[in-house]
Amino acid sequence: ANSVVGVTVLLAVLVLRQADFGIKTSHGLLSIMGIYAILIAGPRLSNMVPPFAAFLINIVCIMLLMIMGCHNVIMYNHSTFVLGYLLLQGYDVTGQDYVLRVIGLLCGMVICMIIFYKNQKNRPYKRTFQDLFYEFNINSARNRWYIKLTFIVSSAMLVMNLLNIPRAMWIGIACMSVCLPFSKDIEGRAGKRGAFNIVGCLIFSIMYIVLPKSMYPYIGMIGGIGVGYSAGYSWQTVFNTFGALSIAAELFG
């Protein structure tokens, strides 16, 4: 289950090589620390409480991830940080495994901070970390998108949890992928998702037949890495399907 930490950190590294937070680079390091603090605590807490309490925790954590990591909307950073949160929540661990998860995420945080500062140190931004919160305005299109995505993802997972359906994270990921900052893009993505989910199912079926059983646990990880390397939404959808079907195969055979 802790292999998901590697996927989460890898996706963050791939993004932070080029993306920024729209604030001073030194203050961007604070955003990275805040994001990783949420990734460490939020998923574990949400798995320790009843569904409605988990719903509230998800709202707070996802909203903070959006505020700290997604100010520069065109970077689509939410597809990395919120995805990481959902993956860690879906692959929950306890005890010594959780200790190892925390260590892995802290190491990942340091790596991300080094790469981010090295690549972004010459950015000319004057906005500070505090400004991300001071500038929050419910009337702005950006902040309305924050709220919309937060409540759609959290509500969808609440319904799954109330129905006692495992791995609620997958409906959260599906909702996140079509809840975009620019409304005109939503219809196109919704159409592509169905078509390329079918492609993903076909490729997964071939892999499931060809690969030995010892490789089955790694198909989901391959999907996570593929998402990080995919520039277009179509292939991101294909690789996301791997993870969902891996869980379905594990649960239902």
Functional labels for PLM-detected ranges:
Residues A1-S79, L83-L202, I206-I222, G226-F239, ...:
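Alpha-helical transmembrane segments and their membrane-interface boundaries
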